[in-house]
């Protein structure tokens, strides 16, 4: 068992998150966060230093495309992922880079290849976890009276031929990294 902090964005409350995870570690609980890594490095590190595993999202390597979809560029995120992959394993932690595959946004070969090459160049060979797109959040937007930003996109299932082709491309471009598809194949050891 263990404790996972996710969001929203856990780093928006980094001081509380860091103290919570410190107490968990003191009590021998496995600790994990899920983050976009969009925060100052010192905020991220205050939290990550107490984690056994950090799941970090890599949405797009092109900063303009990233900005168009998320509202922010990716420079801080890429820098933080790079530092995290260098620093966390020194403390016995593990980084898993997750690439959510959104049809028409980042699931073309060029975008996928750029992400795979980035991950392949990171220290300590983090796992690359490919996340098939799902539209489960659409109903939440409806409940709060907001427009869903990706209307009409269908969820993809784990063994979709396109997803398998993306996984094969990533395995070819990042041969020293474990490349998993969906959440069921993640190595947390």
Model features per residue range: what roles?
Residues 1-136, 142-143:
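Conserved AdoMet/S-adenosylmethionine-binding subsite of the radical SAM
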Residues 103-189:
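Auxiliary Fe-S-binding modules of radical SAM enzymes
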